Amino acid sequence: MGTRLLCWVAFCLLVEELIEAGVVQSPRYKIIEKKQPVAFWCNPISGHNTLYWYLQNLGQGPELLIRYENEEAVDDSQLPKDRFSAERLKGVDSTLKIQPAELGDSAVYLCASSL
């Protein structure tokens, strides 16, 4: 009985570690009216210092919007700066904002991280 309980606890801890191992992005989806602001939040994998925001239009591959090394934006050449903005605080969480959002901004916005 004790061995079975120990195995169950070890399994639960392993599953919890696997669940928490990925990038966390919020919201999963967002529906807004035109001209309203929208913000996306990303928490990268712990220990990763490089963070990426991508935009993926319907039927196309992801396009890099901005890349951060720690807090510094090192490649933001594809970020439309008139209505889009991004920041990364303390080299951890990041936000991507669109204000005001236009119909043409309808897309999938993805966050990724790496060492």
UniProtKB/Swiss-Prot annotation:
Main location: membrane
Cellular location(s): Cell membrane
Gene3D superfamilies (UniProt xref): Immunoglobulins
Cystine residue pairs: 42-111
InterPro entries linked: Ig-like_dom_sf, Ig-like_fold, Ig_V-set, TCR_beta_variable
Keyword Zinc: no
Protein name: T cell receptor beta variable 11-3
One GO BP annotation of this record: cell surface receptor signaling pathway
GO cellular component: plasma membrane; T cell receptor complex
Signal peptide span: 1-21
Domain annotation Ig-like: ranges: 22-115
UniProt keyword terms in alphabetical order: Adaptive immunity, Cell membrane, Disulfide bond, Immunity, Immunoglobulin domain, Membrane, Receptor, Signal, T cell receptor
Subunit structure: Alpha-beta TR is a heterodimer composed of an alpha and beta chain; disulfide-linked. The alpha-beta TR is associated with the transmembrane signaling CD3 coreceptor proteins to form the TR-CD3 (TcR or TCR). The assembly of alpha-beta TR heterodimers with CD3 occurs in the endoplasmic reticulum where a single alpha-beta TR heterodimer associates with one CD3D-CD3E heterodimer, one CD3G-CD3E heterodimer and one CD247 homodimer forming a stable octameric structure. CD3D-CD3E and CD3G-CD3E heterodimers preferentially associate with TR alpha and TR beta chains, respectively.
Pfam family, one: V-set
Purpose of the protein: V region of the variable domain of T cell receptor (TR) beta chain that participates in the antigen recognition. Alpha-beta T cell receptors are antigen specific receptors which are essential to the immune response and are present on the cell surface of T lymphocytes. Recognize peptide-major histocompatibility (MH) (pMH) complexes that are displayed by antigen presenting cells (APC), a prerequisite for efficient T cell adaptive immunity against pathogens.
